[in-house]
Amino acid sequence: MTPILNVSDMQRSFAWFEKLGWRKCWDWGTPPTFGSVGSGECEIFFCLNGQGGRGGDERRPTFGPGADEAAETGVWISVWVDDVDAVHQRCLEQGIEIAWPPTDMPWGVREMHVRHPDGHVLRIGRGIGQT
């Protein structure tokens, strides 16, 4: 499964993920309207301005004229890492918005949240006690 994030600026999104240590895998179009970043075995697609959006229950278009771009923001994605605190330090150094600092949560996960410029949240975590 590969999540698709609807974004407002492809280059800003590539740059934001590169600050996290991810790499740009590919892009499509001139200028790009679709693309991907990857980290290890994980890949996330980007789509410019709502292509392939959900559309909701009101039979709104998912792409093109009449699409409700505001309804397409706010996706959360969980990303599992080896060291949450190292990722936190990298985010601080790169100026990435920290929405929630590294915290040991009652459900047994040390996690932090970072916010993408379009409002998507990456929930970065590791099971407490995992080696």
Q: Where are the predicted features?
A:
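Vicinal oxygen chelate
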Residues: M1-I4, K19-R115, G125-T131
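C-terminal catalytic core of tyrosine-transesterase DNA break-rejoin enzymes
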Residues: D118
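Alpha-helical macromolecular-interaction surfaces
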Residues: Q11-R12, A86
